[in-house]
Amino acid sequence: MHQEYWILEVKVTPKSKQNTIVGFEGEVLKIRVTEVPEKGKANEAVIALLAKALSLPKRDITLIPGDTSRKKRILLPKSTESIVSHWREKGFYAGL
């Protein structure tokens, strides 16, 4: 069976005090991670945080290559789109 995907845009703040999903700023999900932006450490922390929040294995979350800035594009299974839309509608994320 073929899995469908969608793209989530995120803005990452590395070297934060805690790993957390802050909420939406327009269409962009703001995420804070404790890791430094070196050797992919912050990217891995973003993937781990989203995996936990969406109850997915990390292997189902893909960072689209080429993004070295704070703005990232994440490829997610289509089944997660309604969950993230709910976060956007509520104006916050209170799960973590």
From Swiss-Prot:
One GO term describing the cellular component: cytoplasm
InterPro entries, per database record: DUF167 (IPR003746), YggU-like_sf (IPR036591)
Highest taxon of source: Bacteria
Family: Belongs to the UPF0235 family.
NCBIfam families cross-referenced by the UniProt entry: DUF167 family protein, PRK00647.1
The name this protein goes by in its record: UPF0235 protein CAB243
Native organism: Chlamydia abortus (strain DSM 27085 / S26/3) (Chlamydophila abortus)
